[in-house]
Amino acid sequence: MLLIGEYTEFPAWLPADPGSGIALFNSTEGAEPFANTVLSVHNPSFLCADGYGGFYALDEGPQGLLTHFIPDGKSFYFAEQVAFEAQGSCHLCVSPEHKIYISNYDSGTLTVVSDNNGHLEVIQTLYFHGGGPVKSRQ
């Protein structure tokens, strides 16, 4: 199975056609892959396996949003979602202890979320101050 995140909207200055969220592609050996399901998620900027057959989807928007999907046969269903104070969420990784670390580009923060048997909870946000070499992007 292959998961592909597609941005659902773009800024007006970027001439691109919006995607539909998350497309799931399945195939059997020797067969052509096909998209059988589309999960509606706003601007999924990063997808990451949860270690149990499901995955997390990160929404890159004006507020941080993490969505957890659980497998259901050949597709997935929505399990839980948690919002957090951050802008421009762009990457996540999952620790063996089921802590989810989320980097947020625009707000310059790192958000830590715990997954306690399917219950998502924001446990910490780290704030960074200063800037990088390209001042116009900070």
Residue positions per predicted region:
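Blade/loop signatures of beta-propeller domains
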Residues: 11-28
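Short loop/turn segments that connect beta-strands within beta-propeller blades
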Residues: 27-30, 70-74, 115-118
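Blade-loop segments of beta-propeller domains
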Residues: 34-95
